[in-house]
């Protein structure tokens, strides 16, 4: 089955049946961007500004692969390309990567400091298995920097909105403990320990390349055991390292007991300041794919509602839209860089739907099923 990239173009139209007459409707235009025998996709869901478009909107990032119905083989590269919308959606193939998976792609991020021409993606040395992050310049058509660390070969897990840093994680550990979010045969330097003190979330200065360990698995293990001394696991891993819009706090999940491993199943939401202070474990779980709004607010789920959760107060402080608008509030959600357009993507009867809400005037639309 052919896989294509498509985009939704957003505009404004009249009134929406079933809602208040004063509520404007957002119109959608769907345009197919790619075709052919290969699969084309961007990767992640748009959380925390993982955006396909460059600053001007002319170029759209993507990956080209042969198979999307399984995890890639270790020697199976994906082609990095951009779609040039100014040249009749021409595909411009740029590079290749051996660090990708069907769920998250290769963690594309446009560089916030040069969002017109530079972007990040992950790669892996096929000989050593070491993962690293690439900064690529579209104008120069080459890699302008590679963030390689022999002692802790990490890949990008989230770029700060101010372009100052990115969060790095051990994708080899993910390949072992949560395969669908890892890279097959990526080196896992901490595999011999269930809660190593030399692994966890790293923060990397984009300008200098200097890295430091923000929080270790050992710290997280100790924090978990302070809450429950009886907890047992065969190894912790971290998913969804999400930097807030001020670039001074991260929200993430520490997990264990997934993918058939023995022990207690752990799924603990955590937050920490980027200076390493304020590590907090949160009792309130607001869904597996939350999104940062303004300040210290996260968008997530409580029951049937799309809600705002205050990380400082550790409680729900508001609601976004209605259950009628967002029937699956734990769907894949994203908030635009200006924090105005909110999108909830969800599945129903084997079709994907996208509910789009504009916060400034409550305009709303739901896409057809794909």
Language model: regions and residue ranges:
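Blade/loop signatures of beta-propeller domains
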Residues: 21-32
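Short, conserved, GDST-rich strand-edge loop motifs in beta-rich repeat architectures
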Residues: 63-77, 121-126, 168-198, 253-266, ...
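Beta-propeller blade signature
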Residues: 77-86, 132-141, 194-208, 266-275, ...
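Surface-exposed loop and turn segments in beta-propeller and other repeat-based domains
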Residues: 31-42, 93-102, 149-151, 211-233, ...
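Beta-strand-rich domains and repeat architectures in extracellular enzymes and scaffolds
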Residues: 32-78, 241
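Conserved blade-ending motifs and adjacent loop-strand segments that build the rim/top face
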Residues: 283-288, 321-333, 363-370
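Blade-terminus and WD-like Trp-Asp/Gly-His loop motifs, strongest in beta-propeller folds
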Residues: 50-60, 100-126, 156-165, 170, ...
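Blade-loop segments of beta-propeller domains
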Residues: 45-49, 67, 73-125, 286
């Amino acid at each position: 089955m052919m896989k294509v990239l498509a985009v939704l173009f957003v505009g404004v139209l009249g009134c929406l049946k079933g809602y208040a007459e004063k509520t404007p409707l957002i119109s959608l235009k769907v345009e197919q961007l790619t075709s052919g025998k290969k699969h084309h996709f961007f990767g992640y869901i748009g959380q925390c500004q993982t955006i396909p478009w460059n600053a001007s909107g002319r170029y759209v990032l993507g990956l080209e692969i042969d198979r999307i119905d399984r995890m890639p083989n270790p020697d199976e590269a994906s082609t990095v390309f951009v779609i040039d919308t100014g040249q009749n959606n021409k595909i411009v193939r740029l590079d290749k990567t051996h660090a990708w998976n069907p769920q998250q792609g290769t963690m594309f991020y446009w560089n916030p400091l040069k969002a017109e021409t530079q972007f990040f993606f992950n790669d892996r040395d096929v000989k050593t298995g070491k993962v690293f992050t690439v900064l690529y310049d579209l104008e120069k058509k080459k890699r302008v920097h590679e963030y390689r660390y022999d002692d802790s070969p990490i890949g990008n897990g989230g770029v700060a909105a101010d372009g100052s840093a990115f969060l790095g994680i051990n994708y080899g550990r993910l390949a072992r403990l949560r395969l669908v979010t890892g890279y097959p045969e990526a080196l896992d330097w901490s595999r011999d320990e269930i809660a190593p003190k030399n692994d966890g979330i790293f923060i990397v200065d984009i300008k200098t390349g200097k890295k430091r360990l923000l929080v270790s698995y050992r710290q997280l293990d100790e924090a978990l055991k302070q809450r429950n001394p009886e907890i047992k696991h065969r190894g912790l891993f971290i998913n969804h390292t999400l930097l807030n819009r001020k670039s001074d706090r991260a929200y993430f999940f520490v997990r264990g007991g997934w993918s058939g491993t023995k022990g207690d199943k752990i799924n603990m939401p955590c937050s920490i300041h980027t200076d390493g202070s304020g590590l907090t474990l949160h009792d309130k779980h607001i869904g597996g794919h939350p999104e940062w709004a303004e300040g210290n607010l996260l968008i997530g789920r409580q029951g049937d509602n799309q809600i705002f959760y205050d990380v400082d107060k550790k409680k729900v402080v508001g609601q976004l839209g209605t259950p009628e608008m967002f029937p699956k509030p734990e769907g894949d959600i994203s908030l635009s860089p200006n924090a105005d357009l909110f999108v909830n993507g969800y599945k129903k009867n084997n079709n994907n739907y996208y509910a789009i809400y504009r916060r400034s005037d409550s305009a709303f639309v739901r896409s057809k099923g794909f």
